[in-house]
Amino acid sequence: RRRYWDVAEAPIRLLIGKSTPLGLYPTFISPRTGAWTTAKVTMGALSDSFYEYLVKQWLLTGRREPYLRQMFDEAMLAMARHMVQRSSPSGFVYVADYMGHGQLAHKMDHLACFAGAMLAVGAQDGGSYDAEYMTLADAIGETCYEMYRRT
C-alpha cells in the first residue's frame, strides 16, 4: 500500500541530498530541525540497523529504488576509506568509530560485527564493488570470530 510506503520512506527521503560528513551518516539527527546533532559515526549500537536496512530495503523493493543502493554504496566506501583499520600486531581488520574532524575511536562495538554480513549481502549484485565488499566482509567476519573465540 502506498500509504505505508510513504510513512516508511519519509526518514530516508529526509536524508537524500543531505550533507554528510565524508559520506557517512552521524548517529543522531534532530527530529525538529533535521540537523545532525553529533559528528559521531559508528557501525555499532544506534546506527547498525540504518546501514543494514539501506541494502535490504533496496533488495525488498526489487532493486527499483536506485537511491537506496547509491546511499549504501557511498556509505560503505566512506566506511572503508575512513573507519576501517587494522590492529597491530595481530593484523585484524576492525571498524573504528569516527568521532568527527578526522578523529577515530579505535574500538569496535560487537554490534558492528553485522557489517561483514551486510557487506556480503551488498556484494551479491554483480556491482562495481562486489570484490571489495566481499574481501572486507571476510576480514570483518574473521575479526569477529576471533574476538568471540578469544574471550
Where in the sequence are the language-model features?
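Glycan-recognition and catalytic cores of secretory/periplasmic carbohydrate-active enzymes
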Residues: R1-T151
